[in-house]
Every structure is written in C-alpha cells, then in structure tokens.
Amino acid sequence: MKPLSLYHPALYWLRVWQKRLFRHIAWHCSSKRYARPATTSERLPYRYLKHTSKLIRKLGDSDLALQHNKVINLKLAVAAIDGVTIAPGEYFSFCRLVGRPTRQRGYVEGMELSFGEARTGIGGGICQLSNLIHWMAIHSPLVVIERANHSFDPFPDDGRVLPFGSGAAIFYNYIDLVLHNSTDRSFQLKLKVGETQLEGELLCDRERAY
C-alpha cells in the first residue's frame, strides 16, 4: 500500500515540510559537533586519496541543457563544501553545509531522480557531488552514519566510474549524507569542478600508512 502522501501533491509536500522540520529540530537539539564551512584556503599537507567523475553524461534523448545546468548547481554546492575540515570526533553533513538549493541562491533546474524516474528539479544533479564524497569516505577511515541509495541508475552504460551502489541520494534536508570522524586525525575535502570532471581529494594531517 502506498503512503497517503503519494495520493495528492498537497499531502506529499506537507509530509516533506514535516520531515524537514523534524530534521531542523534534531540538528538544533543535537550535542554532536558538525564540521563547519572552511574559513581559509589552507590545505592539509597529505593527500589520502583522489577521485573524479564525468560531468556531462548522455541519458537517451534527455535534454543536455539539464546536464549543463547540473554543472552550475555543482559549482554552488562545491563552493559550500570545498576546504571543509572534519576534525577528530566531528560529523560531516552534506545538507547542513550546502543548505537548501533554491532559485534565490542561484540554483537552476537540473535532472533529479524521484519516484523511480528522471525529472527536472531546482538543484538537480548535486547528488553527483554526494556520490563522489561517499566513495572517498568508504575508502577512508571516515564512518558513514547516514546514506540513502538512488532508486535506479540513469547512466548504466555511459562511462560510469563510480559503481551505482556507491551513490548517495540527497533531498534537503532529511535525505542526507552524514559522515563521522572517529579517528584522532583531521581530514579535509578539496573539491573542484574541472573542464570535464568533478574532482575530489581527501586530505589528512598525517601521512597515510600503507
């Protein structure tokens, strides 16, 4: 049986509002220390790992303009997270750092996955950034506390680098990617939207022990 919220748009958005409110309350009442936006351009000295993913991908007869809009959205999301340091004991929340993607903040319509299909939505495409961060996290000592997978793979044959199962869906603010640094080391995310690739580095304050 489908949830009642799926039978009428008003019920759906009421449920979304409720979940967002609950998440804001949880953030406000939590004693967890969350990583804050970077205030300097300094880099931690050691690279722990690096990864990239292709920016423009073809999905059947989909509008490539949505792919180019995705790049605009990614640049805004990258600017919010680039340089953030996750100190020992701290938590990283994608949604807390990026905030709600709205037209007023410069986000445009891109492709997003919803209810098992590709559709347009403001801020669409920023999940590519959460996918990349999640991939780096699972190949590091960072612990994934919260992560939701996408319902299907829109690009099964177009030069996929990140396995589909490694994705991390985002829907502000209650479908989030949350990491925890349970180590005694600091980690830093350095991110960049290049010419053809979304580029990510995970840096550390100590050399990696191989």
Describe the residue ranges of each PLM region.
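Well-ordered beta-sheet/strand-loop patches within structured domains
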Residues: 1-210
